[in-house]
């Protein structure tokens, strides 16, 4: 028996894959499945926005995870018979003041230096 602590998107996904591989799985969570961080993130996958200085080694994993999402949702939809809606419309970071603008411009330059596909827009 394999025990998984946490019934968010990661714990449930790992449990699903292990069960599909014939393993016996039990998943524990202090609350309802999918109601903590997975619920709060609203299913957002924003590897371009989420990458931070000092986490450069994590970026390939973020990008690979994002690239697998379409295949993952198709398999989950097939196995669960529950329709899954997915949209890839990009992510918008908004500056509400000049300090925000400086932070976004700095982040933009950093993320472009990593080779991420980003565009800096102005409100004009």
Give the positions of each predicted feature.
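N-terminal Rossmann-like FAD-binding beta1-loop-alpha1 element of flavoenzymes
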Residues: 1-27
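A generic, residue-level signal for flexible/boundary positions that often mark functional hotspots
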Residues: 3, 27, 39, 80, ...
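Hydrophobic alpha-helical segments and their boundary regions
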Residues: 4, 30-32, 79, 104
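Short glycine/serine/threonine-biased micro-segments
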Residues: 4-9, 32, 40-44, 88
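Loop/helix-junction capping segments adjacent to catalytic residues or to phosphate/diphosphate-binding pockets
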Residues: 12, 35, 101
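Glycine-rich FAD pyrophosphate-binding loop
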Residues: 19-41
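Dinucleotide-binding Rossmann-like beta1-alpha1 core, especially the glycine-rich loop
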Residues: 44-124
């Amino acid at each position: 028996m394999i025990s998984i602590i946490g019934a968010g998107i990661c714990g449930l996904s790992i449990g699903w894959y292990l069960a599909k591989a014939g393993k016996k799985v039990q998943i524990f969570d202090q609350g309802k499945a999918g109601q903590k961080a997975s619920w709060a993130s609203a299913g957002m996958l924003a590897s371009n926005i989420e990458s931070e200085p000092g986490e450069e080694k994590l970026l390939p994993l973020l990008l690979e995870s994002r690239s697998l999402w379409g295949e993952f949702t198709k398999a989950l939809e097939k196995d669960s018979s529950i329709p899954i809606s997915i949209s890839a419309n990009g992510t918008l970071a908004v500056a509400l003041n000049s300090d925000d603008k400086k932070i976004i411009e700095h982040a933009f330059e950093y993320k472009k230096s990593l080779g991420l596909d980003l565009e800096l827009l102005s409100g004009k």
